[in-house]
């Protein structure tokens, strides 16, 4: 048996805000202000980590938070992700398997984004490691062109985030 230390967070991708390099901080701060305003009834922490924001709810209101964020200008995509500060490959394998076991479908694809370039395992290698682990331990098959389930893995400076849309 293994113990997985992961928590649910809201991953926010912001799009066009970062194309205006000179005004980047202004737009990001404006987006943050809008998020705080929309979520004024919730308790949460927010992490701004270059091209992403992560909202860590202090209660179980993650679904309500996602709904509130839907119409904020500047947000490109919102996902519920599972995060862990343990970025060891064994933990990522266990997290990925646990998350995949919650999905229905027959095929999958792993997509890794390694913004932490100091991380020793490259993105394609991580795709293969995690994909192999899922293949061995579930009935899922790989389909890189049209999978039923995408499993996204983001390896950042201080944590790993895993989500499917």
Predicted regions and their residues:
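RNA-binding accessory domains that recognize and position tRNA/RNA substrates
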Residues: 3-165
């Amino acid at each position: 048996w293994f113990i997985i230390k992961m928590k649910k967070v809201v991953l926010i991708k912001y799009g066009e805000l970062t194309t205006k390099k000179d005004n980047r901080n202004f737009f990001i701060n404006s987006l943050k202000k809008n998020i705080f305003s929309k979520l004024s009834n919730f308790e949460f922490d927010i992490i701004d980590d270059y091209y992403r924001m992560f909202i860590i709810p202090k209660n179980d209101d993650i679904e309500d938070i996602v709904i509130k964020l839907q119409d904020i200008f500047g947000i490109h995509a919102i996902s519920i992700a599972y995060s862990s500060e343990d970025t060891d490959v064994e933990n990522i394998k266990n997290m990925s398997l646990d998350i995949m076991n919650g999905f229905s479908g027959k095929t999958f694809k792993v997509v890794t984004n390694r913004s932490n370039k100091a991380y020793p395992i490259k993105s394609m290698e991580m795709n293969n490691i995690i994909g192999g682990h899922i293949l061995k331990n579930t009935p899922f098959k790989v389909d890189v062109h049209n999978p039923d389930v995408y499993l996204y893995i983001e390896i950042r400076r201080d944590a790993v985030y895993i989500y499917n849309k």
